[in-house]
């Protein structure tokens, strides 16, 4: 009887020991992975949504655009290699929080709500939200969008602005071009997207037009994880230097055909 009790105790001890060893190895693996991410000082990870021409879009399988070249300049000034993670726009801030990316450079407008969850750089572009309608539409301003069906890109300030319109039925899409395709197909009454992408994409839809008066005005900035002031300061320094030495104006000329920021 005593022998059986001893064996049971030994088995229990062995089980507990094996369990503790397994837990220790799991914790070690997690710490090693976290350490490898935090110590990977040669890489700067940019998160973006490459459906936002001319700021970020794909050309020959590569993500290119105004924001990409801005991020490349920041990485170069820091002595790092830029790595780009293309993801859904509404997944960018969660990716910052989890440490999947170092910064979100995606034509992201600064809002009080976003500032609760992220740290922003100095603004680098003045933008606005534009209303797009069919050329034969009688809609001429934001007030005539009341009780209309409006297509937007999910998680954007255009999405937020449209949602505030009285009685509006907002239809969300993963990318701005999808919203315009829905409008061109006659499935919605209007679309609301940012001004620069609107001008780029509407040129491919002969049946659509942009209403002159903007729905709202805003500023684009780079988003960082809360508390990452060091990286934000690096970005601010690069942006300021680019504006001072003409590189910023050269980017505007390359992607917008003018060396001046376009007025909202």
Model-derived regions, located:
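Short helix-initiation/N-cap motifs at beta->coil->alpha
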Residues: 84-94, 154-157, 171-185, 218
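A ligand-binding cleft/hinge motif common to bilobed small-molecule-binding domains
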Residues: 94, 108-116, 161, 184, ...
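A conserved helix-loop-strand patch within extracytoplasmic ligand-binding domains
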Residues: 80, 109, 122-163, 167-170
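Extracytoplasmic small-molecule ligand-binding "clamshell" domains
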Residues: 37-107
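Short beta-strand-centered segments that line the small-molecule binding cleft or hinge
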Residues: 92-107, 115-127, 211
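Extended ligand-binding regions for polar small-molecule ligands
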Residues: 29, 68-77, 143, 149, ...
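Periplasmic-binding protein-like
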Residues: 50, 125-133, 195, 199-240, ...
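Ligand-binding clefts/hinges and TM-proximal coupling segments of bilobed small-molecule sensing domains
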Residues: 17-31, 157-174, 209-214, 237-264
């Amino acid at each position: 009887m005593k022998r059986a009790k001893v064996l049971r105790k030994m088995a229990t001890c062995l089980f507990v020991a094996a369990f503790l060893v397994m837990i220790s190895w799991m914790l070690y693996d997690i710490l090693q992975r976290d350490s490898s991410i935090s110590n990977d000082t040669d890489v700067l990870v940019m998160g973006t949504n490459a459906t936002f021409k001319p700021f970020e879009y794909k050309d020959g399988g590569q993500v290119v655009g105004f924001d990409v070249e801005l991020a490349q300049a920041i990485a170069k000034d820091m002595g790092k290699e830029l790595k780009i993670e293309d993801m859904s726009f509404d997944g960018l801030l969660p990716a910052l929080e989890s440490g999947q990316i170092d910064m979100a450079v995606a034509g992201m407008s600064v809002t009080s709500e976003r500032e609760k969850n992220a740290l922003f750089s100095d603004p680098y572009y003045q933008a606005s939200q534009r209303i797009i309608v069919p050329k034969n539409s009688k809609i001429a301003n934001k007030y005539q969008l009341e009780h209309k069906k409006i297509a937007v890109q999910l998680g954007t300030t255009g999405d937020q602005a449209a949602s505030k319109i009285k009685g509006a039925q907002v239809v969300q899409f993963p990318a701005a071009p999808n919203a315009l395709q829905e409008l061109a197909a006659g499935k919605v009454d209007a679309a609301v997207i940012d001004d620069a992408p609107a001008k780029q994409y509407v040129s491919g839809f002969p049946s659509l037009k942009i209403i002159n008066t903007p729905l709202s005005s805003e500023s684009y900035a780079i988003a960082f994880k809360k508390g990452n002031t060091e990286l934000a300061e690096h970005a601010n320094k690069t942006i300021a230097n680019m504006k001072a030495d003409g590189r910023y104006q050269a980017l505007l000329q390359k992607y917008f055909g003018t060396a001046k920021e376009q007025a909202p």
